[in-house]
């Protein structure tokens, strides 16, 4: 998803300014008073940093309060007021969406007011996702309801070009010159995120 958003183009073929935030929810070690919701990153255009944070997330079970995390992100983040900008939330989970004190209807009302689309991703069977109220389109406007199998392995079909692409990417990274400590840090992060993608499978790494 980060890779796709990073390659987005406007109608006039210019590259838009992409900023993405990341929240974690449903982790029992997070604050109960905050609905087990924790902001990992506010809006940032550093997609390598975002990828690094995504790779570092792990799950340990807990109560998934969907309405709470949607509402929290809508209230805490500085969403642009312009109707011309694409504003969207992607939320993924595998428990009933009605859990918690903050109903998704309240969260969706806030989303509509701010012009934010809410796309839901249920990790499991499609019918079970509907039974657990993840098809929020009628409440949250024009958002989508998607189902994925989190246990399914990604088909990693090797091609004769994989090694060449990886080699050229390493050579390209070697042409960068860091400016100051911040630049050196960003170069190091870029290299680390490359390695994380390589560790998943070749198809993911090539798309990066």
State each model region's role:
Residues 139-141, 145-208:
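C-terminal "exit" segments of structured domains
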């Amino acid at each position: 998803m980060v890779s796709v958003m990073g390659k987005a183009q406007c109608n006039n073929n210019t590259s838009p300014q992409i900023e993405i935030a990341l929240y974690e929810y449903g982790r029992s070690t997070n604050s109960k008073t905050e609905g087990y919701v924790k902001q990992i990153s506010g809006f940032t255009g550093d997609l390598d940093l975002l990828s690094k944070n995504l790779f570092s997330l792990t799950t340990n079970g807990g109560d998934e309060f969907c309405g709470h995390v949607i509402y929290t992100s809508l209230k805490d983040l500085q969403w642009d007021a312009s109707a011309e900008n694409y504003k969207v939330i992607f939320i993924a989970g595998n428990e009933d969406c009605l859990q918690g004190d903050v109903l998704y209807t309240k969260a969706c009302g806030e989303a509509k007011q701010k012009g934010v689309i809410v796309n839901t991703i249920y990790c499991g069977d499609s019918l079970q996702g509907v039974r657990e109220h993840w098809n929020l389109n009628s409440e949250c406007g024009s958002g989508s309801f998607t189902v994925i199998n989190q246990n399914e392995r990604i088909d990693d079909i090797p091609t004769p070009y994989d090694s060449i692409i990886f080699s050229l990417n390493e050579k390209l990274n070697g042409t960068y010159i860091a400016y100051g400590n911040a630049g050196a840090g960003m170069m190091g992060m870029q290299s680390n995120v490359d390695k994380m993608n390589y560790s998943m499978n070749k198809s993911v790494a090539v798309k990066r």
